[in-house]
Amino acid sequence: GLWAVINNAGIGGAAGPTPWLITEDFRAAMNVNFFPLVEISTRFLPLLESANGRIINMASVLGRFSFQGLAPYVSSKYAVEGMSDAYRRCLKPHGVSVHLIEPGFFKTNITNIVENKRRFMQVWTRLNSRLKNQYPLTIVQKYTAGLSAKMDKLCSSDVSKVVSAYERAVTDLRPRARYVVGYDAKYIFLVLQALPEWISDYLMTRVDMKP
């Protein structure tokens, strides 16, 4: 048998306002962040059943509260959340438990400032002339500079908290369904999620890039 399967692969994917994005941007994120998770979990399910094992899936707090500009990534993490909830309820009678790791912002390759600027610019360069006129390069550069400064303050460098959550999900006698990791996840994003949509929408659109 097999005690635990940990699904941890992930990419940030294409970044930019929704009008910039195309179907392939969403497909690319799903092809790494979601579909392999389903395939691996299904493939190892017989071994997990024989050991009353666990599936631990890397999601994100952005799988519970959306962040504009990252729609492909956010969509893939919402898919991970939904799949994990469905699997958890379905597999419980089979002796298999399913658990989610939901980090906030940590300093990783996905949140790397240089990489995020590159992803924004990569999408901007393919836009047609109408969208480039709506979103001039000067506005994009100003927005990405401001976003980088905010991300630098928001991101925690203590990734050991995420590792600790994995360890607990694997070894806890009574593991949680969700392990929310990081102060921003617990005290910013989940608070925003609990607010009425008109309030959270107002707060989030104040930091959005406007044409």
Which residue stretches match the model-derived regions?
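Conserved mid-core segment of classical short-chain dehydrogenase/reductases
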Residues: 12-27, 69-72
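Conserved hydrophobic beta-strands of the Rossmann-like cofactor-binding core
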Residues: 5-6, 55
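Active-site helix of classical SDR
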Residues: 41, 76-79
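A short, exposed helix-loop element centered on a Lys and neighboring polar residues
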Residues: 41-42, 85
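Active-site-adjacent segment of SDR/Rossmann-fold oxidoreductases
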Residues: 65, 86-97
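SDR active-site lid
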Residues: 93-176
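Residue(s) in the substrate-gating loop at a strand-loop-helix junction
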Residues: 60
